């Protein structure tokens, strides 16, 4: 059987480069927007997209490494690709193990956030609001402005300053840290600042919250 070589003209190569250049310009623009504005204090929607993109990087990395190992350029590239594939697989499995442990402790889907393995649990209005905590610290500041609560750069929704919880928790895969309110300062109408400081830690689940039907209806 005779083999035929397919060659491309200069115009076809230039057209192909232009098409891919446009595609990559759009991809890099989207990545820039996600990285620039993907913070919970700016846009929760973009932040969720950022988490989804980060989550997809693991399987994409494994797929590329496995493909390079199956169809190698040479023996050296095959060995390196196999090592990279095994490393990516081990790191992905470790991520899932830690995320499942955190989910069993908190019951929140934020446990699978690839950016952080710390969750801040704040009991408000008869339920517990859970948000990822990017920075691990021994103290957390709560700011209530006109009845809206914000802690560690995360929005927690409507909250009466006078009914702030006396204790919040920070959950990790291997420990639950309790933080107690040590100082509170009111200013304005239903506004103020409260400081929570770590006072104990242990290997237990997040404490259950007793439902307050009246407060739950007010928040609905």
UniProtKB/Swiss-Prot annotation:
Q: Which Gene Ontology molecular-function terms are recorded? A: structural constituent of virion
Q: Give the GO cellular component terms, alphabetically.
A: host cell Golgi membrane; membrane; viral envelope; virion membrane
Give me the Intravirion side stretches, as residue ranges.
41-50, 101-220
Task: Write out the annotated subcellular location.
Answer: Virion membrane; Host Golgi apparatus membrane
| PROSITE patterns for the chain | COV_M
Per UniProt, which keywords does this protein have? Glycoprotein, Host Golgi apparatus, Host membrane, Host-virus interaction, Membrane, Transmembrane, Transmembrane helix, Viral envelope protein, Viral immunoevasion, Viral matrix protein, Virion
**Membrane-related topology note:** Multi-pass membrane protein
Its primary localisation, in coarse terms, equals virion
The UniProt transmembrane annotation reads 20-40, 51-71, 80-100
Outline which residue ranges sit on the Virion surface face: 2-19, 72-79
Family to which this protein belongs:
Belongs to the betacoronaviruses M protein family.
Q: What does this protein do?
A: Component of the viral envelope that plays a central role in virus morphogenesis and assembly via its interactions with other viral proteins.
**Protein name stated in the entry:** Membrane protein
Gene source species: Bat coronavirus HKU5
Q: Gene of origin?
A: M
